[in-house]
Amino acid sequence: MRQLHKQCAAPQQHDARRAARTVVRVASAEPVTSAGAAAANPQTDFKFACPICLTTEFVVQGSAPYQACRCGRCGRSFEAKGQYLDLTLTSGVAQQVYEQKMWQGTELFRQPLVSFVYERGWRQNFAGAGFPGAEKEFEMAMQYLQPAQGGVLIDASCGTGLFTRLFARSKKFAGVVALDFSESMLQQAQQFFAQDAALKAGTPIVAVRGDIGRLPFATGSVDAIHAGAAIHCWPNPQAAMAEISRVLKPGGVFVASTFLTPLAPLGELIGDSTVRPLSQTFNPFGRSNQTFRYWEEDELKDLVAAVGLTDYTRTRSRMFIMFAATKPAAERQPEQW
């Protein structure tokens, strides 16, 4: 049996023909569990993928500190910032001139002050829009995530790890990946992880800096993805949804919560299509001074359908919505001659 370890490990180089055959199965997010480990707290390896080629596998055991990962195929190393891995495209690169222009919603949550106050008052303000609170939202999400329990859960845009901790404490998953683009959010999350005694002997957590538009996982390798109060801050929601669909296994579940337009409560009474002309006034996504967007429910349905997810379902209250969808089984492809 392969020995478990705490560092990233790239697989040995293969010839081009062999690599082409193995692309579809490398970098699975499935855990590999030691047969000798205690059932209550198994040793779990997590598998990630190089964010450039998506084929080179990095194996990580769920405990920090981590070591840097190197992709021999791409000739690139990806940094480990002690308590989290950085698997973004610019990790380990000192760019001389080029700078990616960021969506303001992304940049806002990279500010250390925002990360500090997020669980110290910021998140609680969501109640005014109809969010029922973290504990209730967690319970709702767990209902949607039942088919994926026992697998690995990606808590995407995890922020300070509010839901990551709840998922790990539940012990319903083999492992939880806390994934966010914000360095300061991940640093704050690690502080909360260290302070939470209930996590010390529970479900393993790996913290990763990653781009929701370029997820560092292999195609069809992830059991479930949760994105709590996040999609309204994503710079390109359609591209992010395509990535989510790509990495989910057949039968994998995606669960997310977000803000509906301020007129959503009226829309529930008289129909969203009736209030749509007014709702669009509150949805100026293209304006550069906006940090997030409000959604119509039909827009979320469109995003889900466009990337091939099915079985859309939701819970809605005032401006709050939690929705879920499933990756269907792959259709049988005709044999190629």
Question: Positions of the model-derived regions?
Answer:
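N-terminal chloroplast transit peptides
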Residues: M1-A20
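N-terminal auxiliary segments of SAM/dcSAM-dependent transferases
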Residues: E30-L108
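Conserved class I S-adenosyl-L-methionine
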Residues: G82, T88-A148, L162-L166, S170, ...
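Class I SAM-dependent methyltransferase SAM/SAH-binding core
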Residues: G151-R214
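A short acidic, Gly/Pro-enriched loop at the edge of an enzyme's catalytic core
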Residues: G213-I225
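A short SAM/SAH-binding and catalytic strip from SAM-dependent methyltransferases
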Residues: D223-P237, L260
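A short glycine-rich, Lys/Arg-flanked "PGG" loop and its adjoining helix->strand segment in the class I
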Residues: Q238-P250
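C-terminal alpha-helical "lid/dimerization" subdomain adjacent to the S-adenosyl-L-methionine
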Residues: V255-F323
